[in-house]
Amino acid sequence: MIWSRKDEAGVLATSLKSQWIDAIDASPASNLIAFSSGKTLSVIDATDMGFRRDFQNERTVSGVGFDPKGRRIAASTYGGCALWYARIEQQKPTMLKWAGSHTGVAFSPDGNFVVTTMQDAQLHGWRLKDSKDMRMGGYPSKVRAVGFLSGGQLLATSGAQGAVLWPFIGSNGPMGREATEIGYDEGSLVALVATQPKHGVLAAGLSDGRVWWADPAGQGLNFVKAERGPAIAALALSPNGLRVAWADEEGNAGVVEA
């Protein structure tokens, strides 16, 4: 795993026993970088080359995600999610349990919820103050990407013919509420979504190679890449939410204004 700062050479960080690195996340708030290899969750500090923590999980780690302050890390595994404090060397994780294979993980921007993607085409979540379970299903395919927007009031996901939006308003999050869907197209699937938590917009990359940008509070979609082709394999939104970067499965890529 290589990380770099502007005008500086890249820095190499390796996994224990030279294992394949599976997942990665970084926290601008704490300058920490977390990555997983097998059952090991590793943490390094971008400002302190001597700092490193290696935490052992009971199962293989499939996804990692920092909380908003960069102090805790969620690690998705088979059977649920483990919560670790990023800097404490000797500790036991807090376990959030739910049967099944959890493939990715994210904190809500207010730090009150943790959401995982699952192998069996659904999401699961927990309200952290009481570990209350939240089930979010109904997807026709596996959810590969999630992202919060509108100050954390909405969670956008891939995995359907349109981008699925779950409400995260109030202390109950999506519990007892229905999801909505934008950009529905029967002939394609949303492969990826990209968001910026502070802004109320999102981008979606489709299985047929198209990319659109939208404001859910407005009307219509802006197809920033309208031509069809290989499925979109990577997608990102600029910090101001107004530029979209994409790449497809054949190595084509672009950056476009929304």
Where are these regions (language model features)?
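WD40-repeat beta-propeller superdomains and closely related acidic/aromatic-rich repeat-like regions
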Residues: 1-258
